[in-house]
Each structure stands twice: as structure tokens, then as C-alpha cells.
Design a protein with these regions (language model features):
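Conserved substrate/cofactor phosphate-moiety recognition/catalytic segment
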Residues: 23-67
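The conserved Walker
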Residues: 14
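Hydrophobic anchor at the beta1->P-loop junction of P-loop NTPases
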Residues: 10
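ATP-dependent NMP and nucleoside kinases share a basic, alpha-helical "lid"
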Residues: 47, 51-52, 69-126, 132, ...
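Extreme N-terminal, non-catalytic leader segments
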Residues: 1-7
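Conserved lysine of the Walker
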Residues: 18
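Conserved beta-strand scaffold positions in the cores of enzyme catalytic domains, especially
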Residues: 38, 101-103, 147-149
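Small-molecule kinase domains that catalyze NTP-dependent phosphoryl transfer to phosphate-bearing small molecules
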Residues: 107-110, 115-163, 171-174
Length: 174
């Protein structure tokens, strides 16, 4: 697809479809011969379970992952990153670290995310069993100017993916 590495950063609420699209994109890029790695919020948190959910913890976590993504990018590896990354300031910090940063906002209504709640996290947050849960009792700050917005409420996974690949093809052929 491209010879220049980039960081493709998916952001959005839990259950928006970030990981689904990110995993599909990694397969697509690898099949196209592109060197790439997936950094996924759930996977990384399983490796580092001590990472908390306070604003400070989340900011530090996103910045660490951004630093890792920028290192991989510098070494010619495209990074597909899937993190809720709820705060604009930390996403903007990551953007500045990366040479070729593409922010993909997976815009999905809270209602849709709650319907998709395969992990049961929204139910636990609504019952007060989980606190500082993004979208319930902790804010999500939508990007102001993402390179791409995908609205998974209104699109199938395939439609969203085609929109994503179409955008990436268009921007890499310029």
C-alpha cells in the first residue's frame, strides 16, 4: 500500500468498533506486503494490568503507547493503534511525536456502544461497579479535526472498512 510508515490511531468509545476495524486493517496491510503492528488497548492492558483509569493514568498510558508507536514508525513499521484515548490533549501529544499520524475517529453513539457491550462493562459502570468509565462517569472528548471519521452506527463493518481503505489509498497515492 505504501512505503512510508505511518501511525493509524483509532479512537472512540468502548464498543465503537475500533478493534474490529484495526484488526481487519492489519490483515489487509500485511497481505499487501506492508510491515505493520497492532497496538490494542485491551491487549496492552493485559500485559500491564497495573495501569489505572484515572485521567492521569490514562494520559500517561496513551503517551507511552504513542511513544512506542512513534519508535516503530521511525523504524519503518506502520502502527495500527486502537485505544479509547479519551482526551484530546494526550492524542495531540501523540500526533506531535509521529511523522505521519492519521487519526481515525470511530464515532458511535453511547446507546449503540451499550447495545454492543460484549464485555458487560457498561452494565457494570451503570451499576457503579466500575468507576471512571469513559462515556458514563468519565468524559470522552471527540477529536476536533480527525483525518477520518467512521460512523459505525450507520455502516456495516464492510462499509466502514471500505471507507477506511479508500481514505488510506487516496492519501498514500498523493
Amino acid at each position: 500500500m505504501t512505503e512510508e510508515a505511518r501511525v493509524i490511531w483509532f479512537t472512540g468509545l468502548s464498543g465503537a468498533g475500533k478493534t474490529t476495524l484495526a484488526e481487519k486493517l492489519v490483515c489487509y496491510l500485511k497481505n499487501s506486503g506492508e510491515k505493520c503492528e497492532l497496538l490494542d488497548g485491551d491487549t496492552v492492558r493485559n500485559i500491564f494490568p497495573q495501569t489505572g483509569f484515572s485521567k492521569k493514568d490514562r494520559d500517561e498510558h496513551v503517551k507511552r503507547m504513542g511513544f512506542l508507536a512513534s519508535m516503530l514508525e521511525r523504524n519503518g513499521i506502520t502502527v495500527v493503534a486502537s485505544f479509547i484515548s479519551p482526551y484530546r490533549e494526550s492524542r495531540d501529544f501523540v500526533r506531535k511525536m509521529c511523522k505521519n499520524f492519521i487519526e481515525v475517529y470511530v464515532s458511535t453513539s453511547l446507546e449503540t456502544c451499550e447495545k454492543r457491550d460484549v464485555k458487560g462493562l457498561y452494565k457494570k459502570a451503570r451499576k457503579g461497579e466500575i468507576t471512571s468509565f469513559t462515556g458514563i462517569d468519565d468524559p470522552y472528548e471527540p477529536p476536533l479535526n480527525p483525518e477520518l471519521t467512521i460512523k459505525t452506527d450507520n455502516e456495516t463493518v464492510e462499509e466502514s472498512f471500505e471507507k477506511l481503505v479508500g481514505y488510506l489509498d487516496k492519501t498514500t497515492s498523493q
